[in-house]
């Protein structure tokens, strides 16, 4: 097992032969100390209030992305697929400390899954809202997110956008389709008759966008294990499409850059057999003085190319803003 110290960028390995109780108490004390330091007020520099000019470019122009959407809709009309998730990759030149971006991101875009990895020659920072799959005490769960609108500038506008989202036939149909895909994925490793949908199509709000979310659960079969549960769901339908294989072939055709970590998974597997993983979205990869943020939108027959383009920009905005904010620290 391991305990991570993201401030010092260290992982302390805890071996089965160690005094587990003593190690646990030591780590509790260390966590209390870190919390105490985090609660202390700090002074802000004047630079914190100076606008930072950060040029953001994409691997696709607006016209190219919208052309991809139109091509995907042709595949849908031909019966190849029902839905496909098309993304674009945003790029920003920066010398910012990636860990400072992590610090800003967890404040600007609080999410269920927060992570920072330093692989020496590149770093991965993320704040993902979406569970890929978990197995906790024998319960397999996935949490598809499908259906997105930007946050409003006022409460009234925010409420109006939520009403539009929950009553939009296109968004509801897309969400239902991906929930069905999630049920199929969970069902591959679950006991017969145990798969159910909980909290169907609920609203979750984040800093820049509002999503429609559902919970899909089942009881893990006795002859299955958490790794098989992970493999049954990966890649997520909400990042690929339906049917998955054909959707991924179309993604490979239309997207001009490999996705890398985007759409993959980040998580843990414990000695107790539990696993908890998220989808690598709202994530930035730092390498060679550049930050890369990828975001996608689900394309269906009713999709409007310009709206799908704007959805990808809105999804990337929280991460891009964290990079800009970190430059002021």
Locations of the language-model features?
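Extended alpha-helical targeting/anchoring segments
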Residues: 1-4, 8-329
């Amino acid at each position: 097992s391991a305990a991570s110290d993201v401030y010092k960028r260290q992982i302390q390995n805890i071996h089965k032969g160690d005094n587990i109780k003593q190690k646990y108490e030591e780590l509790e004390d260390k966590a209390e100390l870190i919390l105490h330091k985090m609660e202390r007020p700090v002074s802000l520099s004047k630079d914190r209030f100076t606008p930072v000019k950060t040029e953001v470019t994409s691997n696709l122009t607006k016209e190219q992305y919208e052309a991809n959407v139109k091509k995907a809709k042709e595949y849908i009309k031909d019966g190849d697929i029902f839905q496909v998730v098309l993304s674009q990759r945003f790029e920003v030149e920066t010398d910012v400390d990636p860990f400072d971006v992590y610090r800003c991101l967890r404040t600007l875009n609080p999410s269920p899954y927060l992570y920072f990895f330093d692989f020496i020659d590149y770093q991965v920072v993320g704040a993902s809202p979406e569970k890929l799959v978990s197995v906790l005490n024998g319960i397999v769960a996935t949490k598809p997110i499908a259906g997105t609108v930007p946050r409003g500038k006022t409460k009234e506008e925010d409420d109006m956008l939520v009403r539009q989202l929950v009553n939009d036939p296109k968004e509801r149909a897309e969400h239902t389709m991906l929930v069905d895909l999630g049920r199929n994925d969970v069902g591959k490793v679950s006991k017969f008759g145990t798969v159910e949908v909980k909290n169907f199509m609920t609203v979750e709000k984040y800093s820049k966008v509002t999503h429609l979310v559902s919970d899909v659960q089942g009881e893990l079969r006795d002859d299955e294990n958490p790794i098989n549960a992970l493999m049954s769901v990966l890649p997520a339908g909400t990042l690929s499409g339906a049917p998955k294989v054909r959707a991924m072939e179309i993604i490979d055709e239309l997207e001009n850059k490999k996705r890398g970590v985007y759409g993959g998974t980040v998580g843990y597997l414990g000695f107790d057999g539990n696993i908890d993983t998220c989808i690598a979205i709202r994530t930035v990869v730092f390498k060679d003085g550049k930050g890369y943020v990828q975001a996608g939108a689900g394309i269906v027959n009713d999709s409007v190319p310009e709206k799908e383009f704007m959805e990808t920009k809105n999804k990337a905005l929280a991460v891009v803003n964290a990079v800009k904010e970190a430059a002021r620290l």
